[in-house]
């Protein structure tokens, strides 16, 4: 526990001392979200964006991205809370709901961007305020965009920019797939978590 605190503190100091322009900062809670945002990072890099930083609470992400991105490991919640309060960047891109409830927003971060890690309805599995404090939302499709606009009207939430990006996770699966593979057909039984 103390080791995580110390590593988190050291990485927070390194992050704040990094004088590079912080254009795109991604935050990931776990390596299990990696496939949900990796295609977005790769597309930004393909378009020539160089100022991409990953802050992660999973040490495995640091190892995975060490040759690709600047990464900072911050796992300790107290240090993470400080990071979120003092963050100075143009875009913070994350998949954390109820922003401003558990972790506070920084006045120095221009745009908070949410991307989905589920294809579910925004009105069925999330809290009413799950997306209230975001500036930009990357929606998986028209159904989510319509639900988000409906919530803005119904609850008088601030209007946000909603961009239909599709589901990044499906891009990741497609990029990994080997379409030339000849296999016998299988039946997949995949129960949902709801």
Which residues make up each language-model segment?
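Membrane-proximal basic amphipathic "stem/tether" segments
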Residues: 1-30
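Nucleotide-sugar donor-binding and catalytic loop/hinge architecture
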Residues: 12-22, 174-193
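Active-site and donor-binding regions of nucleotide-sugar-utilizing enzymes
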Residues: 23-174, 191
